[in-house]
Amino acid sequence: GIGLEVGVGTGRFAAPLGIGMGVEPAKAMAEMARKRGIDVHEARAEALPFGDESFDFVLMVTAICFLENPLQALKEAKRVLKPEGLIIIGMIDRNSPFGRDYERKKTASKFYKRANFHSADEVLSMLRSLNFDHVATHQTIFKSLKEISAVEPFEEGHGKGGFVAIAAKKRA
């Protein structure tokens, strides 16, 4: 189907996943994504420059923590999704050892300095308030960064893993 990555950044995820369309407000990042072949609109997640029901799925990877108004951004994602379209959110769960590590160190991080981390439950609650059907949550990264020596497993659910993938479906 036709997908959109909101907060496409440099196109690091969109390009290998074959997502040709992205939204990114940061000029330098948008330029890098364009070099990877992504059609990037320099816009904000809270005001997407697309018509209603334009996409089969919307992807947001480590983007929700940078949004001024996550609920408004999710409303916009819902608006541009076709009926039964999927929203897929990859996020750092604030309520995990990994998330707490990031929260503590964010002032020293170039990338996460301005981040406002959320818990998976908060994001699921926002999705429910917008009448999305909860499809699935999966989690990984069960240790602090210092303790990880190999690829961490993926498990269903959320609440333990530091990185959570949430998939929810727009009602028909």
What name fits each language-model region?
Residues 2-47:
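Class I SAM-dependent methyltransferase SAM/SAH-binding core
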Residues 115-137:
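Short alpha-helix
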Residues 71-83:
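A short glycine-rich, Lys/Arg-flanked "PGG" loop and its adjoining helix->strand segment in the class I
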Residues 55-56:
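Local beta-strand N-terminus motif with an aromatic residue
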Residues 62-65:
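Short catalytic micro-motifs in class I SAM-dependent methyltransferases
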Residues 86-115:
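Conserved class I S-adenosyl-L-methionine
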Residues 150-172:
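Core SAM-dependent methyltransferase catalytic element
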Residues 59:
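A conserved beta-strand element that flanks and buttresses the S-adenosyl-L-methionine
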